Amino acid sequence: MRRFELKIQRGREVETRIMRANGFGSLEGMAQDMISDDYKITKITITNLATDEVKVVR
C-alpha cells in the first residue's frame, strides 16, 4: 500500500488528510463521491507521497 495526501478544498478552507491505498483509482472514486455528497467541496488534490505524482479531482 502507498501513502497519499488528500487536500480537500472548501472555499478558502483546506483540510489535509493522509491516507493509504493501492493506487489513484480508488481514491479518485472516493473523491468524486465526497464532492457529490458535500456541495461545499470545490477541489480535491491527491498527491502520491513517494513519487510526488499529483491528480486533481473537481
Each predicted region: which residue ranges?
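A short, exposed loop/beta-hairpin motif centered on an aromatic-Gly-Thr core
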Residues: 13-25
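Short acidic, gly/pro-rich beta-turn/loop elements at beta-sheet edges
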Residues: 16, 29, 54-56
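A structural detector for beta-sheet-dominated domains
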Residues: 9, 20-22, 47
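Short aromatic-glycine-(Arg/Gly/Cys) micro-motifs in beta-strand/loop hairpins
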Residues: 1-15
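A short, charged, amphipathic alpha-helix used as a generic interaction element across diverse proteins
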Residues: 22-43
